[in-house]
């Protein structure tokens, strides 16, 4: 039997039945907030608290609304899927097992054995519900995030509520995995938690070394909280620094005089003010862990973090959202810098634009030339055959171009009448969470040697989620061409489409390739597995 996890804050822990009861209560309490969010203005990462019923999405052989070179192979329903991370383990008999760690909104994280991608099986998890509940994993350490929908307390974390009653449920829980080599399943135990009010943990990223955690709060604190994990196995996780935007430094509650942490104001490379540019949403690291790439909503930062645990974070460069004429009416400019990952060879930085925050930008599903959030490519080193990149470097990024999916005609969604009954019936279609070939969870290569999790795609290919437009695979090796039989969007100036799949009910949060399969968290469908056949 796999373990649902137990809460070590209370003697004897929580039984599975008690945990499920807490989950049901938390989801019931969270529902009004999700509905309220559906009617609010643009925000990043929309919340949907109710998945489609299992009988609607788990039918074997259900045809896609549209697909080329990407085939649907499996579904786990009944959860609101978000981010996915991968790793592998070896059982007692010497067989390698592959695992998907799936974040959920309102249901805690789940672990699935995907050694046979067509037949995922439960292998563990932890019922500690809350929003957004993105997941990170490095070896035996797992992190889950809580930030509410609009800052409200929607977390069922007993640790946060017991240790930090004034934190309003905002922060992260940190767990230890115990792998049973005989059963090839996991027991999950709570190690500790870290509160970071008032903004909470929208995302969190483990550093490649495992020595620290970056908690990203884009939408309230405008900060990255640096959490010291050097003694985490002893239950110690210490908030050391808050890397904060200048405009938030003196805001109430952000850098209080009695705080245990030290605030560090982020600046431009020359030390001048970068006020209102630093809204960290997601981070990625170089292979050696010395450089951090920060998708900061209003811009994208490249930062030297080799001495971050001593309070030093030096800005190397800032990539502006507006790099071409026309402002935000020009899709080649970025509205929301959402994710910024470096290619496995360190030469190309890929930045995603989550236009409309995933909520309001639906024109790309309603009209052929509607605005959509795309992928933007910047050279950080010379790219053979592209002479304008001769002087490219981390301190001098050079724009290569942008990619927009060709928005193929899809069949009418047979599940639309059921989707219309949910709190937010309209699905956005902007790009969301992606994985580059040759990369693991947080950087090029594995986050920890021996646990794999690295995409097998070539280093100029990627898989990505597109919310209501499903799962896509593309090459970013060069300029677009339609000679392969796929007509590219006329606005694309870099990259080529390799395939896609839009399943009924798709509202896909993340799509990450591993060993030939693409694993996708989906807010309506749950957890999906695809196979790229190109």
Where are these regions (language model features)?
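N-terminal secretory signal peptides that target proteins for export/translocation
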Residues: 1-16
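Hydrophobic alpha-helical segments and their boundary regions
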Residues: 13-21, 459, 515
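Intrinsically disordered, low-complexity repeat segments enriched in small/polar residues
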Residues: 10-13, 28, 34, 38
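Feature marking well-ordered beta-strand scaffolds used for ligand recognition
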Residues: 35-534
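Bacterial N-terminal signal peptides
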Residues: 19-32
């Amino acid at each position: 039997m796999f373990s649902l996890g137990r809460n070590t804050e209370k003697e004897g822990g929580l039984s599975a039945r008690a945990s499920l009861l807490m989950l049901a209560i938390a989801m019931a309490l969270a529902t009004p907030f999700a509905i309220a969010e559906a009617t609010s203005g643009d925000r990043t990462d929309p919340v949907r608290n109710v998945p489609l019923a299992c009988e609607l999405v788990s039918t074997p052989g259900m045809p896609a609304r549209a697909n080329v070179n990407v085939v649907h192979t499996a579904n786990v329903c009944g959860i609101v899927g978000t981010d996915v991370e991968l790793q592998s383990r070896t059982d007692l008999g010497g067989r390698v097992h592959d695992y998907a760690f799936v974040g959920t909104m309102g249901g805690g994280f789940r672990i699935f054995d995907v050694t046979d991608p067509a037949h995922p099986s439960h292998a563990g998890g932890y019922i500690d519900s809350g929003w957004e509940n993105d997941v990170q994993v490095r070896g035996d350490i797992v992190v889950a995030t809580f930030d509410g929908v609009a800052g409200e307390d929607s977390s069922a974390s007993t640790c946060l509520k017991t240790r930090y009653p004034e934190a309003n449920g905002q922060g992260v829980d940190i767990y230890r995995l115990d792998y049973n080599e005989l059963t090839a399943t996991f027991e999950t135990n709570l190690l500790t938690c870290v509160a970071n009010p008032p903004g909470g943990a929208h995302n969190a990223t483990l550093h490649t070394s495992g020595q620290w955690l970056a908690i990203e709060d884009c939408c309230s604190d405008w900060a990255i909280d640096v959490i010291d994990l050097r003694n985490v196995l002893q239950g110690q996780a210490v908030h050391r620094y808050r890397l904060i935007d200048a405009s938030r430094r003196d805001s109430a509650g952000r850098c209080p005089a009695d705080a245990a942490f030290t605030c560090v104001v982020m600046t431009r490379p020359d030390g001048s003010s970068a006020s209102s540019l630093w809204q960290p949403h997601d981070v990625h690291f170089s292979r050696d862990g010395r450089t951090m790439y920060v998708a900061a909503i209003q811009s994208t930062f490249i930062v030297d973090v080799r001495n971050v645990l001593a309070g030093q974070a030096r800005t190397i460069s800032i990539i502006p959202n507006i790099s071409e004429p026309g402002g935000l009416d020009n899709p080649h400019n970025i509205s929301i810098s959402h994710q910024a990952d470096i290619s496995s060879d360190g030469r190309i930085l890929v930045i995603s634009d989550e236009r409309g925050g995933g909520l309001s930008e639906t024109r790309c599903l309603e009209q052929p030339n509607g605005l959509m959030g795309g992928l933007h490519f910047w050279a950080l080193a010379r790219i053979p055959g592209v002479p304008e990149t001769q002087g490219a470097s981390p301190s001098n990024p050079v724009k290569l171009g942008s990619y927009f999916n060709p928005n193929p005609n899809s069949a009418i969604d047979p599940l639309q009448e059921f989707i219309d009954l949910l709190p937010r019936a309209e699905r956005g279609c902007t790009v969301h969470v992606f994985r580059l070939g040759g990369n693991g969870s947080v950087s090029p290569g594995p986050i920890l040697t021996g646990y794999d999790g690295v995409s097998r795609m070539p280093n100029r290919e990627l898989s990505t989620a597109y919310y209501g437009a499903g799962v896509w695979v593309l090459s970013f090796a060069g300029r677009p061409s339609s000679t392969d039989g796929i007509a590219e969007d006329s606005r694309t100036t870099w990259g080529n489409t390799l395939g896609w799949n839009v399943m009924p009910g798709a509202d896909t949060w993340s799509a990450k390739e591993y060993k030939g399969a693409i694993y996708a968290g989906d807010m309506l469908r749950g957890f999906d597995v695809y196979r790229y056949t190109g």
